[in-house]
């Protein structure tokens, strides 16, 4: 029932509304139309505002996107700029590294190649290289050897001044005798003077034929530069950097103090190793020593004057040569070129040996060059002694054994080669002695072919003087 009543009430209300609308006056209808128009205008304004807001939002979104793109572009630009800045910074760091530090690891060949290329492209570099070469005495100092005993400094100046202006000249003399030691030095003011003088290395000065070379090449042996002795050594050894810094010093007596030697050679530059080659038991020199400098320039300075006076000894310096190890015949000689070389032989008679001996750089007498001699006997003395023993032996009651031993020892000390009689006429090495001339020799054949092998109990040619080997070569020591 209740539901039915509600439905009826709703129907009655709906029926009343149209009736009320019909009962509205024209004025009310007009007002209603105006209200509807106002409401419609408000709706249109709201819609227009919404459209404007949407357009503004779209513009703002576009602006935000543009700003984002600009920020991204700016970020990328900053990154590129930062990378470029860091790259240039690293390059500047590389450029700031000192040139000397860059060149130190380079080999000599690399530095020479760079300098040559730079000199070919830049004239100022070539001029600077020439200036440095002119200042360095290595290219201007000449060593001359084979001079006579009476050669003076004035003689050298007169002989070499024709090649260029001389800055300094010195003929080396013995302090005691006052005679020339057979060599000297000439320092020119320019490289051209030294080059002109070396165009003809052999020169006749006085009555002697001399030879000259750059002093930086070191001493000479037998008239040939020391460089010739290195022919058998591999080329890579002589060109190695270590070899360029090492010098060899000969004629170093055992009485010399190694520490004083080190101080003496340190004035040419810092020494890395040395003195090397000392006796492992006594700690003293064995006739030679080696020094290794920190740089090759220091070694060159030490070799500018190859012959140095130290505590009364003449030390002979040269560039060390790393040659092959000595064989059995040279096992007691620490330098492979020293076996037949008088300059390497230790001799207590410093600087007073005969021509060809270690104390002088004179051209040896060809008559005394037949064998490896240590001393050359005066022919007059040998002839007198031989004649005395041959003709007066019986009258003086000489013991034959003593006579033979005397002749044998003289032959050994003089380095006499029985085949050629070094230092005396050839006939004295091979002449025969008639039987009966000397008592006790009648039962022996003549001294055919030289001195006979000594009998038991007799002295012979195998026993020489103290410090002299069986063939006349001075004893080097172990």
From Swiss-Prot:
Expression triggers: By wounding.
Coiled-coil region: none
Keywords: Nucleus, Repeat, RNA-binding
Region of interest (Disordered), ranges: 1-99, 321-359, 442-478
Name of this chain's protein: UBP1-associated protein 2A
Keyword RNA-binding attached: yes
Comp. bias (Gly residues): 457-470
Source organism of this protein record: Arabidopsis thaliana (Mouse-ear cress)
Subcellular location: Nucleus
Transmembrane recorded as keyword: no
């Amino acid at each position: 029932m209740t539901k039915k009543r509600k439905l009826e009430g709703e129907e009655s209300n709906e029926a009343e509304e149209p009736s009320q609308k019909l009962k509205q006056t024209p004025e009310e209808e007009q007002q209603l139309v105006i209200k509807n128009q106002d409401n419609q205008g408000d709706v249109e304004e709201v819609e227009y505002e919404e459209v404007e807001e949407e357009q503004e939002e779209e513009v703002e979104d576009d602006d935000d996107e543009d700003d984002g793109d600009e920020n991204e572009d700016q970020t990328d630009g900053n990154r590129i700029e930062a990378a470029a800045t860091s790259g240039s910074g690293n390059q500047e760091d590389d450029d700031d590294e000192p040139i000397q530090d860059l060149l130190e690891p380079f080999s000599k060949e690399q530095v020479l190649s760079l300098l040559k290329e730079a000199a070919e492209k830049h004239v100022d570099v070539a001029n600077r290289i020439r200036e440095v070469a002119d200042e360095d005495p290595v290219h201007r100092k000449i060593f001359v050897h084979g001079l006579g005993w009476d050669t003076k400094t004035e003689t050298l100046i007169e002989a070499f001044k024709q090649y260029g202006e001389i800055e300094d000249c010195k003929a080396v003399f013995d302090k005691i005798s006052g005679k020339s030691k057979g060599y000297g030095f000439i320092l020119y003011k320019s490289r051209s003077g030294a080059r002109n003088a070396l165009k003809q290395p052999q020169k006749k000065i006085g009555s002697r034929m001399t030879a000259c070379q750059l002093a930086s090449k070191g001493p000479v042996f037998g008239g040939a530069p020391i460089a010739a002795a290195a022919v058998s050594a591999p080329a890579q050894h002589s060109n190695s950097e270590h070899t360029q810094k090492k010098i060899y010093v000969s004629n170093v007596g055992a009485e010399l103090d190694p520490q004083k030697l080190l101080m003496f050679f340190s004035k040419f530059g810092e020494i890395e190793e040395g003195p090397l080659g000392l006796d492992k038991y006594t700690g003293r020199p064995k006739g030679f020593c080696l020094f290794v400098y920190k740089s090759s320039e220091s070694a060159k300075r030490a070799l500018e004057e190859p012959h140095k006076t130290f505590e009364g000894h003449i030390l002979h310096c040269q560039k060390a040569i790393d040659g092959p190890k000595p064989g059995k015949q040279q096992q007691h000689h620490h330098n492979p070129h020293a076996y037949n070389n008088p300059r390497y032989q230790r001799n207590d008679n410093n600087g007073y040996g005969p021509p060809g001996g270690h104390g002088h750089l004179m051209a040896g007498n060809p008559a005394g060059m037949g064998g490896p001699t240590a001393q050359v006997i005066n022919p007059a003395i040998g002839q007198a002694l031989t004649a005395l023993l041959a003709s007066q032996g019986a009258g003086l009651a000489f013991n034959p054994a003593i006579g033979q031993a005397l002749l044998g020892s003289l032959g050994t000390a003089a380095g006499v080669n029985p085949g050629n009689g070094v230092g005396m006429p050839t006939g004295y090495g091979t002449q025969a002695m008639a039987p009966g001339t000397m008592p006790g020799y009648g039962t022996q054949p003549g001294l055919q072919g030289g001195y006979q092998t000594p009998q038991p109990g007799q002295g012979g040619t195998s026993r020489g003087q103290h410090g002299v080997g069986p063939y006349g070569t001075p004893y080097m020591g172990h």
